[in-house]
Design a protein with these regions (language model features):
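Transmembrane-helix signature of 12-pass secondary carriers
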Residues: 1-432
Length: 432
C-alpha cells in the first residue's frame, strides 16, 4: 500500500508542479521517466542482492531508504531536486518487489494464488488513500505536505518489519543455512501454538554462493525460453498499467487544455501557463474511481477508449479508465505470481528483479505517450500504441512453455542433465 502511494503520487505531482513551477509537458514526463530509471536500476540490483544476502535484509533497507528520500522530496527547492530525489525513491521501490518473493516462498500452492491476488487490495487501498488525502491536502496545504504524508506510512511500518518479518525459509535452505532455518521454524511453531517439527532440517537442493543470484542462471537451457518470453510481457504490462495511471489525470482534462499545446507552430522553449489548471474535485473523483478499478477483474478492450474522445460525458471516460486499470492491475499480479513460481529459489529474487527492471523500461517510456504524444500529437496514435503492444503480449503469453498451476516451487537449477528439467522447468509434481 505504501509503495502504491509513492507511485500514484506521480499522477498528482505532475499537473500540480506544471502550474506552480511553469513546467512544460516534456518536463512533467521527464519527472516520471527519471523515477522509472531509478526503479530500473534498483530492481536489478536489489533483486541480485536478495539472492545473496536475503529477502528480509533487502526489504528492510529499501523500505527505510524510500521513506528517507520521500521525506526529503517534500522539502525540494527546485524541479531538479524533485527529479533527483524521486529518482532515488524509484531506485529503492525497486527493492519492494522482493515482498512478492518472500510472500510466495512462505505460501503453499493451494493458497498461493489467492494470497498474492489479495495483495491487490492493499495496493488499491494505498492508491485510494493517497487520492483522498491529496483531495484534501493539495488545495489547502500544498503538494509538499502530501509528499511527506505519502512517505510517512513506510517510516511507521519499518519497526514492525524489524520485529515481525522473518527471513525466507527457502532462501535459508538454498543457502545451506539449516540452523537459522530451524530457528525460524521453531519461532513460527511457537507463534502459531504448534509443536516443533521432529527431526533435523536438511536441504536437498543447496546452491553455492557463486551460482546463487547469478544472471547466467536465468538463461540456463532449461529455462531460457521462459526468461526471453517474459521480458516483453513485463514490458507491455508496465507500459499499459502506468500509462493508465497517468491518463487518469490527463484524459479527464482535455477540454481545459491550452490551444497552444497542440499548435504546430508553438515554440517548445516557451511554456504557456495562461490556462494552466490545477486538479479540481472532478479530477480527483475521476482518479479515485479509476484507482478502485483495480478491484475489478473484467476483460476490456483498450480500443474502446479511442472511440470516446472529449465530446462525451466525463463519466464515460472515467468508467473506461476504471475497467482498463482493473485489467492492467490483474495482469501485473499474474506476472509477479508466475515469475515467482517458475524460477527456483536460488535465482527467484534475481528473476523478479530483472523482469521488474525490464518493466521499468516500459514505465519509463509510457509518459512520452501518455503525457506528450497523446496531448500534443494524436489521441488515436497514442491509444493505437497501447493496443498494438497488448495484442502482441497476448500472443506471447499463450506461447509460454511452462504451466505452474499446482506444481511445487523448486529450490535450485540442477546442473546434472538428467535432473535439470525436473528442478528448473517444473516437471516435478510434488505438492507443497
Amino acid at each position: 500500500a505504501a509503495d502504491a502511494m509513492e507511485m500514484l503520487l506521480l499522477a498528482i505531482l505532475g499537473p500540480t508542479l506544471r502550474c506552480e513551477w511553469h513546467l512544460s509537458h516534456a518536463q512533467v514526463a521527464a519527472m516520471t521517466t527519471f523515477v522509472f530509471i531509478g526503479m530500473l536500476l534498483g530492481a536489478s540490483i536489489w533483486g541480485a542482492a536478495a539472492d545473496k544476502v536475503g529477502r528480509r535484509t533487502v526489504l528492510l533497507v529499501s523500505t527505510a531508504l524510500i521513506a528517507y528520500f520521500g521525506l526529503l522530496c517534500s522539502a525540494a527547492p527546485s524541479y531538479a531536486w524533485v527529479v533527483t530525489l524521486r529518482c532515488f525513491v524509484g531506485f529503492n521501490i525497486g527493492g519492494g518487489a522482493q515482498s512478492y518473493t518472500l510472500l510466495t516462498e512462505y505460501l503453499p500452492h493451494r493458497t498461493r494464488v489467492a494470497a498474492i491476488v489479495s495483495n491487490l487490495l492493499s495496493w488499491c487501498a494505498g492508491g485510494i488513500f493517497l487520492v483522498l488525502t491529496a483531495w484534501v491536502i493539495v488545495p489547502t496545504l500544498g503538494w509538499r505536505w502530501l509528499t511527506a504524508l505519502a512517505a510517512a506510512p513506510l517510516a511507521l511500518v519499518l519497526p514492525l518489519m524489524l520485529l515481525f518479518l522473518p527471513e525466507s525459509l527457502r532462501y535459508l535452505l538454498a543457502s545451506g543455512r539449516e540452523v537459522e532455518a530451524a530457528k525460524v521454524m521453531e519461532l513460527m511453531a511457537k507463534e502459531n501454538g504448534r509443536p516443533p517439527l521432529p527431526g533435523e532440517l536438511v536441504s536437498q537442493q543447496f546452491t553455492d554462493a557463486s551460482r546463487r543470484g547469478h544472471v547466467s542462471q536465468l538463461f540456463h537451457s532449461s529455462i531460457r525460453r521462459v526468461t526471453l518470453t517474459l521480458f516483453p510481457i513485463w514490458f507491455t504490462i508496465a507500459f499499459t498499467y502506468y500509462g493508465i495511471i497517468l491518463l487518469s489525470s490527463d484524459v479527464t482534462s482535455f477540454k481545459q487544455r491550452c490551444p497552444s499545446d497542440n499548435s504546430p507552430t508553438r515554440d517548445s522553449s516557451i511554456v504557456d501557463t495562461s490556462c494552466c489548471r490545477n486538479l479540481n474535485s472532478q479530477d480527483y473523483k475521476s482518479i479515485l474511481l479509476a484507482s478502485t478499478g483495480e478491484l475489478v477483474i473484467l476483460p476490456f478492450n483498450l480500443i474502446l477508449l479511442d472511440r470516446i474522445g472529449p465530446c462525451v460525458p466525463a463519466w464515460t471516460t472515467t468508467a473506461f479508465l476504471f475497467l482498463t486499470r482493473g485489467c492492467a492491475a490483474a495482469l501485473f499480479n499474474w506476472c509477479y505470481l508466475y515469475t515467482a513460481e517458475v524460477y527456483p529459489t536460488s535465482i527467484r529474487s534475481l528473476g523478479i528483479g530483472l523482469h521488474s527492471a525490464v518493466a521499468r523500461v516500459g514505465s519509463m517510456l509510457t509518459p512520452l505517450v501518455a503525457q506528450v504524444l497523446l496531448p500534443q500529437v494524436s489521441v488515436s496514435l497514442a491509444f493505437s500504441t497501447y493496443i498494438g503492444l497488448n495484442l502482441a503480449c497476448c500472443c506471447l503469453a499463450i506461447s509460454l512453455p511452462v504451466e505452474t498451476l499446482g506444481r511445487a516451487m523448486q529450490q535450485s537449477i540442477i546442473v546434472d542433465d538428467s535432473s535439470t528439467s525436473a528442478a528448473a522447468s517444473g516437471v516435478d509434481e510434488k505438492k507443497d
